[in-house]
Every structure is written in C-alpha cells, then in structure tokens.
Amino acid sequence: MASLVAGIDEVGRGCIAGPVIAAAVIFAPGQDTHGLADSKRLRPDRRLVLAGRICSESLAWAVGRAEVSEIDQLNILRATHLAMCRAVAALPVLPDWVRVDGNRYPPLDCPGEAIVGGDASVAEIAAASILAKVFRDREMEVLDRLCPGYALGVHKGYPTRLHIDRLASRGASFFHRRSFAPVRAVIDRSSAS
C-alpha cells in the first residue's frame, strides 16, 4: 500500500495583523497534480481556481489557525506550529509522512521533514500554500469590510507603507499583533501622548 503524504504550509507569518493560517493537503498516490505552484507565484484568480480543484480532488485537506492573541502570547514561530498541528489534526485521515515548507518541523505526532523551498518543489506543499493563501486572503477581505479604514483587503495585513500609515493614523485595532514592532510602536506613541 502506498503511503499517504501530507504537505503543510502557512500564510501570514510576516503580517502585523490577523491570524496565521496553515493548510494541510493529502493527494491520493499517483494523483495528477499538474499546474500546482507556490501560491506567491500565482495570480489571485488562478489561486482561486486551483483552490477549488484542490478541495474537490484531493484525498484530504484541512485548515488550521492561530489567532492574534495566540501569536502575541506564544510568538510567531510557536503560533505557526500550532496552526500547522491544528491543520493536521483536522484531516479526516492521518498521513504516514508530513512535508512542511520551511526549516523547522512542528511538534506533530507523525513523522516527516521540513523542506526549505518546499512550496516550489513538492506538490502537496504547493497545494497547502494555495489553500492557506486563499483562506487567509478571504478572511482579511471580510475583516476589511467589518473594520474599514485599514485597507486590509489591499495589503492583507502585511506591513506595507499603506498599512503602517493607516495604523499610525487610526491606532491599533483588535486584529493587530501587539507583539510586533510596528504595532507596539504605535501603541507606545499613543500611550505617551
């Protein structure tokens, strides 16, 4: 019997707002994975098409997350690993082996490996990167509608010039990571006033 391999990737580590989202994907052995690529290399419309295909054609997929409060409490690496563990735990079948994009393997209960650049070389990881990106981008777009003024739908929580300017003029909101330097600086300035 062929082994089941899960790929895991995350989106949102470098953001100053919103959760970190991880996805885990398992393909059936021998399944066609043509067209998958690192989510950062794909246009948003192509990511959406591929995400639909991944959800409908993969053997299993799941998404895990770590909230802003967990990121601030644990640190971003531990919170990322927590999101990855939650994604694997949510899979309807357990993998025999896990491949994670990056240089550190999370504390999973199954064996595996960390692969630097895995989102560009391993189909399961590429698929996970696509799902994580689509899920997180959608969440940030919803948050943008609920809390207008920060342009979250544009920068998705990354520390762009636009985001930093809006953060400075509006102050930090509940979705900002207070343990991250740009957010902390805004909070410190407003406390000093």
UniProtKB/Swiss-Prot annotation:
Keyword Metal-binding: yes
Residues the entry annotates as binding a divalent metal cation: D9, E10, D101
GO annotations of cellular component type: cytoplasm; ribonuclease H2 complex
CDD domains xref list: RNase_HII_bacteria_HII_like
GO molecular function, one term: RNA binding
Keywords assigned: Cytoplasm, Endonuclease, Hydrolase, Manganese, Metal-binding, Nuclease
Function per UniProt: Endonuclease that specifically degrades the RNA of RNA-DNA hybrids.
The protein's name in its UniProt record: Ribonuclease HII
Native source organism of the sequence: Methylococcus capsulatus (strain ATCC 33009 / NCIMB 11132 / Bath)
